[in-house]
Regions:
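Pre-Walker A (pre-P-loop) alpha-helix and adjacent loop at the N terminus of AAA/AAA+ ATPase modules
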Residues: 4-50
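Conserved, well-folded catalytic cores of nucleic-acid-processing
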Residues: 14-17, 21, 25, 35-39, ...
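Walker A/P-loop
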Residues: 36-74, 87
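Conserved AAA+/SF3 P-loop NTPase catalytic/coupling segment centered on the Walker-B
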Residues: 100-127
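Conserved small/polar residues in nucleotide/adenosyl-binding loops
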Residues: 133-135
């Protein structure tokens, strides 16, 4: 019961901190916090210029999360999202270079503008298939 009360206090403080930056979106803030607690993914669809990126940055700051943003375009490759192995000449081995999804909060902007292979790589990462072998 004590943990539940502490979680509620923490979520309220986080919501209050986010509301200092994001005005008039109280219901969305609560829904995003609930989804984050459940370990889910969030899809924000809206017209340009209404503060989706600002909201993501506010969340990352309020919750002390590592934040990455990627603008998806036709030239973004799957490895940009998920990472890749690069040869290390000094050791003769391959070093993993993590992609943009290796963070706590990842904002994928304009997903529809990229190739289907890159979209598939993003969906695999969202399903948790990417990263298990790398961490």
């Amino acid at each position: 019961m004590e943990i539940d009360k502490r979680l509620i206090v923490l979520l309220k403080r986080s919501a209050d901190e986010i509301k200092k930056t994001v005005i008039g979106k109280d219901d969305i803030i609560i829904k995003i916090l609930m989804t984050a607690c459940a370990g889910g993914h969030i899809l924000l669809e809206d017209i340009p210029g209404v503060g989706k990126t600002t909201m993501a940055v506010a969340f990352s700051k309020a919750l002390s999360l590592k934040y990455n943003r990627m603008q998806f375009t036709s030239d973004v490759m799957p490895a940009d999202v998920t990472g890749f192995y690069m040869p290390n000449r000094a050791t003769g081995e391959f070093d993993f270079k993590p992609g943009a999804v290796f963070c706590n909060l990842f904002l994928a902007d304009e997903i529809n503008r990229t190739s289907s292979k890159t979209q598939s790589a993003l969906l695999e990462a969202m399903e948790g298939e990417i990263g298990r072998a790398h961490v």
